[in-house]
Amino acid sequence: MFKELYRDSIVKSLKDKFNYGNIMQVPKLVKVCINMGVGGAATDNKAINEPFDDLYLIAGQKPVSTFAKKSISGFKIRKGATVGCKVTLRRDKMYEFLERLIYVALPREKDFRGFSVKQFDGNGNFSFGIKEHISFLEIDYDKISKIRGMDINIVTSAASDKEAKELLLAFKFPFFD
C-alpha cells in the first residue's frame, strides 16, 4: 500500500511542491535500518537468541549480529563480543514495515506524542527509538523475558531535512512540531 501511495500520489505532490524538473529528483525512501542492543549478550551467549528472534519477527528478515569494536571494562565487554543485532530493510519489506510501524506500533507506544524535527541528521535522514518492542503485534507478550527497545534509522534520498520531512509527512508520520 505504501509503495503504491508513493508512486501514485506522493511523487506528484512533492514534484509540484518543490518544482522538480524530473521525477527522478523527487526524494524517496532508500532503506530502513533497525538496531536492537542487548546488554547481557556480552556475558551470556544465549541472551542474544531471544532479541534475534524478536527482530526477525518484527522485520520479516533475518538479522545479523553486531560486535563490540573495542573492550570496555566498565561494561564487561570484550572486543569482538556480540552486543546486539541489526537488520536493513529495502524495497517491499521496507514499505511493509513502515506501514506496520505507523499504523500499529506507534499508536500502541506509551506516552508517544509524535516525532521532533530535531531527529533529522541534516542530510535528509531520520532516526528515532522505540522504548518497547512489544508495540508490534508480532511479539507475544507472554513469551518474552524482557522488554527491549530498538533504534530505527530511515535513510532517504532527500537533499535537505525540509524535503525529507515533507516526504515522511506524506507517509503520515506523526510530527509534533
UniProtKB/Swiss-Prot annotation:
Q: Which gene encodes it?
A: rplE
- Family that this chain belongs to: Belongs to the universal ribosomal protein uL5 family.
A molecular function (GO) held by this record is: structural constituent of ribosome
Q: Does the keyword tRNA-binding apply?
A: yes
- A Pfam family of the record is Ribosomal_L5
Q: Name the domain of life this protein comes from.
A: Bacteria
Q: Which NCBIfam families match?
A: PRK00010.1 (NF000585)
Q: What does this protein do?
A: This is one of the proteins that bind and probably mediate the attachment of the 5S RNA into the large ribosomal subunit, where it forms part of the central protuberance. In the 70S ribosome it contacts protein S13 of the 30S subunit (bridge B1b), connecting the 2 subunits; this bridge is implicated in subunit movement. Contacts the P site tRNA; the 5S rRNA and some of its associated proteins might help stabilize positioning of ribosome-bound tRNAs.
Which species? Wolbachia sp. subsp. Brugia malayi (strain TRS)
Q: Which GO terms describe its cellular component?
A: ribonucleoprotein complex; ribosome
Summary of subunit composition and partner proteins: Part of the 50S ribosomal subunit; part of the 5S rRNA/L5/L18/L25 subcomplex. Contacts the 5S rRNA and the P site tRNA. Forms a bridge to the 30S subunit in the 70S ribosome.
Q: What is this protein called?
A: Large ribosomal subunit protein uL5
Q: Is this entry keyworded tRNA-binding?
A: yes
Q: Which UniProt keywords apply?
A: Ribonucleoprotein, Ribosomal protein, RNA-binding, rRNA-binding, tRNA-binding
GO BP annotation list:
translation
